[in-house]
Each structure stands twice: as C-alpha cells, then as structure tokens.
Curated annotation (Swiss-Prot):
It comes from Buchnera aphidicola subsp. Acyrthosiphon pisum (strain APS) (Acyrthosiphon pisum symbiotic bacterium). The active site is at S679, K722. This is Lon protease. Induction: By heat shock. InterPro entries: AAA+_ATPase, ATPase_AAA_core, Lon_bac, Lon_bac/euk-typ, Lon_lid, Lon_proteolytic, Lon_Prtase, Lon_prtase_N.
C-alpha cells in the first residue's frame, strides 16, 4: 500500500457477494474466484491491507467497476489458508471506512485509490440518551428474534465507543444487502443509530405479529394433540375393559359401506379418496366433519337398488279407478307406459306434466301412479324456489353445504327408480339474476339425465330410471322446460263427477277425520248437489271438501251437546242450518232478458268462468269507453266488434251515423279483476247490437268466440272448461265457434246432453240465436 496524500491511499480491492464488512468486525471469508485469490496474494506480499467492497448484484462472477458500491471497508488479513480444492480461507478484521475515488483493473485484480472516512463524533448531551435507547430497542429485538444469542448484550454493554456499538449491532442483525450498505455509508453516528432504531422498530412489529401467529398455531396444535391423546387413552381404557371388541373401527365400517353401495367407478374412487383424507384428520376437527358428511351422503344415495315395477295392467287400472274418479286420459297414458314396460325391461321413464286448475287431483294422482306402478313416491314442492342450488346443490366450499333437493329426496327414497312429483312447477321464482327452471332442463331431458351432476357430490348421477311427474295450474312454464314434458290437461269436474267424488272419497274421509261413526251422520245426494250449486263455484273439489268438513264439525258439536241425539241427516232442506245462507245463485244469471247485457265464457287458471258484458248507448259525439280492467287484446276486440256493427248497420236497422251521435260504454263487472283475451269478440258485438237496437239478449244464452272485421267467428281455447262453467251456471244454450266442433268429443256426454250447443261460423248466426227478435231487416 503506497501513500499518496495524507487522506488517500492506493490499495487492492476484493469484491464480496452478499457480505458487508464493518470496522471492528472479525470474520472468516472463503474466496474462490481467481481474481480474488490474486488480490489476497498481492495483499499478503505487501502490508496485508485490503479494501473489501460489496457487489450490487451477487449473481455476477466477473463484476465491473459499475457493479461495485463506492464505499467499503479497509481491512487487515489476519490469517490465510489454502484449501485442497484450490480455494482460499482468510480471516479478516475490518479497520476503517473508505470511499473509492478511482477504481482500475490491472489485469489480475482491482486496484483503487481510496479516501479514508473519519466518523463524526456525537454531541455529549445526546450520546448517552441515544446509546441507551438503541440498547433498549436492540434488547427488545433479540428477545423476539431467537436467532441472536442474549450473550451479545454483555458484549455491547462493554463497548464505550458509539461508532463501534452501531457497527456491532448492525453486524448482528439479519439486514438486507442495501440496508447493510446504508449503515456503512452513513457517516454521522447519530444518523446511523437512528437508522438502526427505525429498522429495529419495523422488525419488532413484524416479529410480534409472527409471535402471535405462532402462539395461535401452537395452541391449536396442542388442542388437536390433546384431543388425539385423550381419544387414544379412551381407546386404550376401553380395550383393557374389553369394550373395544364391541366398537368396530369407523374407517373399516365406512370402507365396507362404500363397497356394498356398488357405486360407479368414478364415484367410488372419489369417495375412497375422501376416506383417505378422513383417516389423516383429527376426529374432532371441523374439516373432518365436512368430509364425513360428504362420505355419508355418497353412501346414502341409491346407486343400484331398484323397486320392481308392477306389470299387471288390470291391477294397475283397478288402483287408479279406486283412487280417482274420471281422469281417463291420464289413466290411459299410465297404462300405456306399463304395457310397454311389460314387453321391454329397459325403457326411459316418461316425463309427464299434469296441467289443470286447483283441486282437480293432480298431486294425489301422482301418489296413485306410484301405487299402480309399484314405485316409491317422492315429492318436491317447487313453489317459491328461487335458487339454482336448491336443485343442483351447494358446492362444498360453502359452510353448511348440502346436496340439492333431488339428491336429498333420492337418498330418502333409497331406490333409484321412484316416482318423482315436481309439484307446482309453474310457481318457481324467476328474475334476471336467478332461474332455477334452467337447472331442471338437464333433469327433465331423458337424453341427458343419466349424467346429472350435483354440485355437492361432484360426480354424475343417473336419473334415467326415475319417473318424473310435474304439476302446474297453467302453461306459464319456460318454453325449453315445457318442450321436455308430455302435457296432459286435467279440466274441471262435472256435477256428476263432483257428486261421485264427494260420496266415494271426501265424505268418508271427513267422517274419519272428525271422529264420527257412519251411523251417526248421513249427507244425502240432494244435500251434496245443493252444496255444489249454491255454496261452491270451482273447477276442483277443495271448496266442496271444506263445506263437507264444516258440516261434520257441526254435527259432532250437536251430538256432544244433545245426548238424546243419536243420528243426524243433512238434506237440501236443512242444509242452511249447517252452512248458512246460499253464496251463489245457480241457474239465475240475469233472471230476465236485458238490453245490452250478454253472458260470455272465459278461461282462467282455476277453470272456466261466466263473464257478464254490459253495453250502454247514450247521446254523444261518438266516444267509445271501456272499463273493467280490460287488457289490450280485449280492448281491440271491442274496436273490431264496433267496426263489424258499423259495416252491417243498414242490415241491422241502425242509422249509419250512429257512431257520430252516440257514445258507447262497454263494461265488464268486477272491475278490480284484470281481464284479457280475444274470445269475447262475439259477445262484445252482440252487446253493442242489443244496445243500439233496443233488442234484449236471452238470459239463458252464453257465447264464446273471436270475431274478425268481416264477422267471421274464429276458434278459441279452453272449450271444455268454458262448457263446464256454463253447465255449473245453469246456462241452457251455448254458442261456440264452428271450428271448435271437433273438440266436443272430449266433453263428457252428460255435459253435452245438458246443454244446447250451437257451432256458429258468422256473427249473423250469433245475433239470430241470442237476441229476442231477429235483428236483420
């Protein structure tokens, strides 16, 4: 080392990787690079002084001057040892900081002209406080950082030089390379100590968080280990007492159940994998409960077990006839399915959809189909379901997740070929966010449901053996879903059917439910018919059953209060005592023929209804008014009917300018009830003609049919329901579109025989049959 000026020297430079040497440090170094070895040899041949400086990037084997920091440490080589592998081990002691002013490469190693750095002293008033604070903080730090021995505190307490104290603290802290270099480069001791305190404060915060985490983990592990230890102790005690012989191993039980369930390969492999996970878990852990629940569901779901389908058509027909009166179309369809089943063992289960008004027996019919086919009966109420997960199940990532209702019900049935009743399929909630009906598309597609995937099970499940029967009050079902089902319509019951149903099913059921004996009460046929006429007006029989139940309750009360009373007979004469005043007028719609008042026939979701249409013509300026919560289609029917009347005004004896001098008001009573549909066109036209010509409409005539501008009557839907409504209402004559004549074959004979039905083609026929006087001149 040659002295150039008092504060500058020339010295060999040794680059270091990931190491920063501070003054007063004694540290061994292993040197392997040839240039570094040459540098050490040069130093040893002179005064054993060397400049140690850190590389900015440790990955570079051949660093350039740009790859080295500017400030390093002048050090002395205390010992050098050449190792057999060619590397060199040296013991170094740091002496003083130095700043490189000029760095060159002489071909063998780096040589630098450096300027020695003298540290600035602390002010006396700050020295003691700063050192004490630094020491306290470092003590807190090493108590949290278990890697630094506590003995270092004794060493630090004996250091009186603040510069040496700062460098010693930095040397014992696991700092990043840039932070180590920053400590080396800070010349002011005050700043250097404050920098170290800032780093220690940050590290203490992190170490405290780590300590809390370690404490929680340790506590949890101790709890799990304690539970495991106690469980093992219990097992050992039970074994000593001989109780373990009676308690078989749970894992063996589950493995045996998995094998006996005869799952498909995919499901079995999935379940066995979960069982392996369960073996490695603590029995008391939350995750073990989740896995155990999954395995239980996989075992409970029926994978192969089936009930034997009955193939005796005569017995099946007998069961259907016993359980339900009428409904021949549905019964025929079930018998057709059983007939094919008797010829071919494997056929896809039919997917039927029973559509009809409330109370006609759709749900109870599902039970009868199950009985007649020998299947187990399973029912899901779909009304109000708004989440797809109710059908497909929840994924196991969610807390409290379960399979969907389909899989739950299949597990409850314990066979894979039950009859599945999807009740009220039209009542599922739908909006822009959720559509549970879409989840049923796969279920109700016989080509796809053999691979139904429940989100909880995560494996395919075969639903192709299930017989699905859906029920609905209307056709308000998504088109893709409707397309997958075979639609069977159930119309309302006739009076004779209601009488038979009441006598065969409703009356005996209510006697039993209310604790009556058959010899204590008798409800005559005349009483039942009076209930049908005057106390109910419905397509089904629910209200009829409620009225019979009401009679039975009052009969029980009378028998208990009057001990002398042994038998009660209810007939049409004393019915009022049990049910009160009549609620409806049967066969008395208007009583007398009236001008501008026509009886139309309407279809609703609960069956057919009689629809009164009123029209009044007054002097005015040609204003047309319609009231009664009428929909757009019905409003258009009124306008079409008015145009027909204007086009035939001459023939009807009406002045041509009537529409300019008269205001016409069309009203449909029960204004709070919305009404719509095209089938009231003929009735609207008849009411307008009656009002304009002062020609009364016959009160015993009802009509239905859409009208065109040329007076043609177009066909309508729901004819059976409308004719049943006319029959219930005591109507004698019904006018229907001519093209609906073919639908009369579906109407019960007693209804057709009780009505005078006229198929009509033109409005002229309607007016001639419905008005008192022949309107045409």
């Amino acid at each position: 080392m040659n002295s150039e000026r008092s504060e500058r020297i020339t010295i060999p430079v040794l680059p270091l990787r990931d190491v920063v040497i501070y003054p007063h440090m004694v540290i061994p170094l292993f040197v392997g690079r040839q240039k570094s070895i040459k540098c050490i040899e040069t130093s040893m041949s002179n005064d054993k002084k060397i400049m140690l400086i850190a590389q900015k990037e440790a990955s570079k084997d051949e660093p350039t001057p740009k790859d080295l920091f500017d400030i390093g440490t002048i050090s002395a080589i205390l010992q050098m040892l050449k190792l057999p592998d060619g590397t060199v081990k040296v013991l170094i002691e740091g002496l003083q900081r130095a700043h490189i002013k000029n760095l060159t490469n002489n071909g063998e190693h780096f040589i630098a002209e450096v300027e020695l750095i003298s540290s600035s002293n602390l002010l006396d008033k700050n020295q003691e406080v700063l050192i004490r604070t630094t020491m306290n903080q470092f003590e807190s730090y090493i108590k949290l950082n278990k890697k630094i021995p506590l003995e270092i505190l004794n060493v630090l307490n004996n250091i009186k030089n603040s510069e040496k104290l700062a460098d010693t603290i930095a040397a014992h802290m696991p700092l990043k390379l840039n932070d180590k270099q920053s400590v080396l480069e800070i010349r002011n001791i005050n700043d250097r100590l404050e920098f170290l305190m800032a780093i220690m404060e940050s590290e203490i915060d992190l170490l405290q968080v780590e300590k809390r985490i370690r404490h929680r983990v340790k506590k949890q592990m101790e709890k799990s280990q304690r539970e495991y230890y106690l469980n093992e102790q219990i097992k050992a005690i039970q074994k000593e007492l001989g109780d373990m012989d009676e308690i078989p191993d749970e894992n063996k039980i589950l493995k045996r159940k998995i094998k006996s369930s005869k799952m498909p390969k995919e499901a079995r492999e999935k379940t066995e994998l979960e069982l392996q996970k369960l073996k490695m878990m603590s029995p008391m852990s939350a995750e073990a409960t989740v896995v155990r629940s999954y395995i239980d569901w996989m075992i409970q779901v029926p994978w192969y077990l089936k009930t034997k389908i009955k193939k005796d058509l005569q017995q099946a027909k007998k069961i259907l006839d016993i359980d339900h009166f009428g409904l021949e179309t549905v019964k025929d369809r079930i018998l057709e399915y059983l007939a094919v089943q008797s010829r071919k063992n494997k056929i896809k289960g039919p997917i039927l959809c029973l559509i009809g008004p409330p109370g006609v027996g759709k749900t109870s019919l599902g039970k009868s189909i199950a009985r007649s086919t020998g299947r187990k009966y399973v029912r899901i109420a779909l009304g109000g379901i708004r989440d797809e997960a109710e059908i497909r199940g929840h994924r196991r990532t969610y807390i409290g997740s379960m399979p969907g209702k389909l899989i739950q019900k299949m597990a409850k049935a314990k066979v894979k070929n039950p009859l599945f009743l999807l009740d009220e399929i039209d009542k599922m909630s739908r909006d822009i966010r959720v559509d549970p009906a879409s989840a049923l598309l796969e279920v109700l597609d016989s080509e796809q449901n053999m691979n139904f995937n429940d989100h909880y099970l995560e494996v395919d499940y075969d639903l192709s053996d299930v017989m699905f029967v859906a029920t609905s009050n209307s056709m308000n079902i998504p088109a893709p879903l409707l397309d997958r089902m075979e639609i069977i319509r159930l119309s309302g019951y006739t009076e004779d059917e209601k009488l038979n149903i009441a006598k065969r099913y409703l009356y005996p059921k209510q006697i039993e439910r209310n604790g009556l004996e058959e010899n204590e009460i008798k409800i005559t046929d005349s009483a039942i018919i009076s209930i049908i006429h005057y106390y109910t007006r419905e397509a089904g029989v629910r209200s009829l059953e409620r009225e019979i139940s009401k009679i039975c309750r009052k009969a029980v009360k009378n028998l208990i209060l009057d001990k002398s009373l042994k038998h009660i007979e209810i007939n049409s004469k004393n019915l009022k005592k049990f049910l009160g005043i009549k609620r409806f007028d049967y066969g008395k719609i208007h009583g007398t023929n009236q001008i501008g008042q026509v009886i139309g026939l309407a279809w609703t979701e609960v069956g057919g209804e009689l629809l009164t249409i009123e029209t009044t013509c007054v002097s005015g300026k040609g204003k047309l008014t319609y009231t009664g919560s009428l929909g757009e289609v019905m409003q258009e029917s009124i306008q079409a009917a008015l145009t027909v009347v204007r086009s035939q005004a001459d023939r009807l004896g009406i002045k041509k300018d009537f529409h300019e001098k008269h205001d016409i008001h069309v009203h449909v009573p029960e204004g709070a009830t919305p009404k719509d549909g095209p089938s009231a066109g003929a009735a609207m036209c008849t009411a307008i003609v009656s009002s304009l010509t002062n020609n009364p409409v016959k009160s015993n005539v009802a009509m239905t049919g859409e009208i065109t501008l040329h007076g043609k009557i177009l066909p309508i839907g729901g004819l059976k329901e409308k004719l049943l409504a006319a029959h219930r209402g005591g109507i004698k004559t019904v006018l229907i579109p001519y093209e609906n004549k073919r639908n009369l074959e579906e109407i019960p004979k007693n209804i057709i025989e009780g009505l005078n039905i006229h198929p009509i083609k033109k409005i002229e026929e309607v007016l001639k049959l419905s008005l008192e006087k022949i309107p045409y001149v």
